């Protein structure tokens, strides 16, 4: 591993270990814009060897993290409730920065070993982290115009808990974080934009336009690597995905399905129909 590659991975680790949101964003932007273009990751030895229990991602002291059921429900019609909604988006984006960094750091070596495409994998997930840092900054700055900032409301750790649950396997991570958790945002964002437009906060609507556009690309990246890994491992991508949904007791569709966005993000209509049918039985299974 050359000195430049060592410096690169040290900054990836530093960004992951940084709790301050603004400093984390600065480090991520520098990583993607300045360091990444200078390196070539060719050999397996160019990637760090990570074990599943390694977890170095840092989070700020605030927001206070609680169980999803314990996040206070506030009316969207009130200023505080509206700010809490934007805060929830900022929290998702902050977690997504760590998810992009962690994927590159944790699984780059696996992508090189299994597919011979470690550099492409690292570039993809650092691009995700870079764009998520922009999303976080946009939402947090807008939140400040309402008199609030990131950390002012409680939040939950559901997104990161799934990252920890899939820390042992690049294939499971690609299957469940971008294709399930991040893809839900494709469905939810247009509905939320309509509600925000009724408040005439068109700056927030425009921010969500940027987020939706980029998230389509992020889910596409997840789909690409999931299918590449499934093919390499000789797995039936749809059948095995169904088994994962049962294993983790996950329901994907929670309301309106944004079919157009999901297809742009790499799902096929056949796959979406398959998942929908599977979920009808899965919902009954989960209720038992």
UniProtKB/Swiss-Prot annotation:
Name under which the protein is recorded: Uncharacterized protein HI_0077
InterPro entries assigned to the protein according to its UniProt record, in alphabetical order: DUF455 (IPR007402), Ferritin-like_SF (IPR009078), UCP012318 (IPR011197)
Source organism (scientific name): Haemophilus influenzae (strain ATCC 51907 / DSM 11121 / KW20 / Rd)
Database matches in Pfam families: DUF455
PANTHER family according to UniProt: DUF455 DOMAIN-CONTAINING PROTEIN (PTHR42782:SF4), SI:CH73-314G15.3 (PTHR42782)
Coiled-coil regions, chain positions: none
CDD domains in alphabetical order: Ferritin_like (cd00657)
